[in-house]
């Protein structure tokens, strides 16, 4: 039984592989080992675009600057004695000109039976990666161009490029074949360059605030720090069940105990749950913890961090347009301070329900009549859980401008201190929302080991009553660390993929992940 790979049957692939054989028969290695001492195309443009270089005649006389660079051939047209191409390198392009009497092909023998210009026109294809040396000049229209003296084939492409105008129209193909998407779409390249810059800016800001970047284990013997279903695997060497982390929290708090007063980690987190427009099972987070802070300090840090990023990306401006809300395009201002209100206040303002005026059975009735939640999600819910459900259903998608929603019900987390005012039904937790989605989760961290054990054990009792619940097992090492003594602290977690979505006007989380999780496609079998 053989497996049929679709692209191997394409006419274009077969045609290009025949060219590949012809190139090898000419004594040219189509996949050489290196091409060094190159400038990047953007460097060339930056250095020479405003210079007085002269015209093509000066280039033919070799009187203009000589450059050496490499990139992918993305456009080509033959015009008799001259042929013109466009080379893409990272996110920069430059025009090149091949001349019948001037341009040579590296490795092509004089008696090969084919001239250099014919080799360029007949044996090269769009998508080939080339090394080029030549002389700079400006065309009559002012286009910076390289008169190519020598072209070196660095990689023969065997699959044609996507259409230069349509690109990859099928979103699923774009996500599966991101390499082709990046080649064909300048907007896609810009999105991922912005993502990389956002990561750099996060580190820049956190370093300025005296935080230490650390790395903690991805494989864990016990999972915790969030309410989520883990991925489970087996460590063969120890015959032990292991989990991919669902949060960075517990390990970072252990470092606080160890005397590292400000720590953060940017890393992958894994949750074996649903896939939708804003969720991918593998995603990137930053979590940070600062000794001697509380959630008020963290609020300032979070909004200042995001404002810092937005200003850096937008020439000092704090406003960003987002186009993918059901209500239509919105302009959001990330300038600090952000709107702050308690969860109860937000339900009153945006949901029209003052929860303090309603008994539990009345809150259940509101959930029944004003939401599409199944009855089982709230019929046995505690008062705090009912309040959290009302917020999720009536408020979240209305939080377009940046909001900090504070003072959540105790039932929403076991890792947070109760309100210092003495109301033990609420905790010093806030979540930051923007464009109808959660962006950040943060606490005044609980450091009382006895209270922490009590809350975790209460979660375990709930788990026993509902085996399908997401409450995590107790981490005894974490409790032991708390007994050693953890300073008062504030901490936060931000979903970086979702932040990138907001700042690049992306409709889906898949648009900001190089390789999002996709359903596997089985190869055809004979």
From Swiss-Prot:
Mg(2+) 2 binds at residue 438. It is an enzyme of class 6 (ligase). Its EC number is 6.1.1.6. Mg(2+) 1 binds at residues 431, 438. It comes from Chlamydia trachomatis serovar D (strain ATCC VR-885 / DSM 19411 / UW-3/Cx). InterPro entries: Aa-tRNA-synt_II, aa-tRNA-synth_II, aa-tRNA-synth_II/BPL/LPL, Lys-tRNA-ligase_II, Lys-tRNA-ligase_II_N, Lys-tRNA-synth_II_C, NA-bd_OB-fold, NA-bd_OB_tRNA. This is Lysine--tRNA ligase. Homodimer. It is found in: Cytoplasm. Belongs to the class-II aminoacyl-tRNA synthetase family. Gene3D superfamilies: Bira Bifunctional Protein, Domain 2, Nucleic acid-binding proteins. It comes from the Bacteria. GO terms for biological process: lysyl-tRNA aminoacylation. One of its GO terms (molecular function) is ATP binding. Binds 3 Mg(2+) ions per subunit. Its cofactor is Mg(2+). The lineage of its organism: Bacteria, Pseudomonadati, Chlamydiota, Chlamydiia, Chlamydiales.
């Amino acid at each position: 039984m053989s497996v049929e790979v679709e692209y191997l049957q394409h006419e274009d692939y077969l045609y290009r592989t025949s060219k590949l054989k012809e190139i090898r028969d000419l004594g040219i290695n189509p996949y050489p080992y290196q091409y060094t001492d190159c400038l990047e195309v953007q460097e060339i443009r930056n250095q020479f675009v405003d210079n007085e270089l002269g015209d093509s005649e000066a280039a033919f006389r070799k009187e203009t600057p000589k450059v050496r660079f490499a990139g992918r051939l993305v456009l080509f047209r033959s015009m008799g004695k001259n042929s013109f191409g466009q080379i893409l390198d990272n996110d920069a392009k430059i025009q090149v000109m091949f001349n019948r009497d001037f341009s040579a092909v590296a490795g092509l023998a004089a008696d090969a039976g084919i001239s250099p210009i014919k080799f360029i026109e007949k044996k090269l294809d769009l998508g080939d990666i080339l090394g080029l040396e030549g002389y700079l000049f400006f065309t009559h229209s002012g286009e910076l161009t390289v008169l190519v003296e020598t072209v070196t084939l660095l990689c023969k492409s065997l699959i044609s490029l996507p259409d230069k105008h349509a690109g990859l129209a099928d979103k699923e193909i774009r996500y599966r074949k991101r390499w082709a998407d990046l080649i064909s779409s300048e907007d896609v390249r810009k999105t991922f360059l912005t993502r990389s810059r956002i990561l750099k800016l996060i580190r820049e800001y956190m370093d300025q605030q005296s935080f230490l970047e650390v790395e903690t284990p991805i494989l864990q013997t016990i999972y915790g720090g969030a309410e989520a279903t883990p991925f489970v695997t087996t460590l063969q060497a120890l015959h032990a069940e292991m989990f991919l982390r669902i949060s960075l929290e517990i390990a970072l708090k252990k470092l606080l105990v160890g005397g590292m007063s400000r720590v953060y980690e940017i890393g992958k987190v894994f949750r074996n749950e649903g896939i939708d427009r804003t969720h991918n099972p593998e995603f990137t987070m930053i979590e940070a913890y600062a000794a001697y802070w509380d959630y008020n300090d963290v609020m300032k840090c979070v909004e200042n961090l995001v404002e810092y990023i937005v200003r850096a990306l937008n020439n000092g401006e704090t406003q960003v347009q987002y186009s993918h809300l059901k209500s239509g395009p919105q302009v959001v201002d990330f300038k600090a301070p952000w709107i702050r209100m308690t969860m109860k206040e937000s339900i009153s303002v945006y949901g029209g329900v003052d929860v303090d005026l309603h008994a539990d059975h009345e809150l259940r009735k509101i959930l029944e009549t004003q939401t599409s939640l199944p009855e089982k999600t709230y019929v046995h819910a505690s008062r705090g859980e009912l309040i959290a459900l009302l917020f999720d259903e009536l408020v979240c998608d209305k939080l377009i401008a940046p909001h900090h929603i504070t003072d959540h019900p105790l039932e929403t987390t076991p890792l947070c201190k109760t309100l210092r005012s003495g109301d033990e039904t609420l905790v010093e937790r806030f979540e930051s929302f923007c464009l109808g989605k959660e962006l950040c989760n943060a606490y005044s961290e609980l450091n009382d080991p006895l209270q922490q054990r009590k809350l975790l054990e209460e979660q375990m009792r709930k788990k026993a009553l509902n085996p399908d619940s997401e409450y995590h097992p107790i981490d005894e090492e974490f409790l032991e660390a708390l007994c050693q003594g953890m300073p008062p602290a504030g901490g936060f977690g931000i979903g970086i993929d979702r932040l990138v979505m907001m700042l690049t006007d992306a409709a889906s989380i898949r648009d900001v992940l190089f390789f999002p999780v996709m359903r596997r496609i089985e190869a055809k079998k004979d």
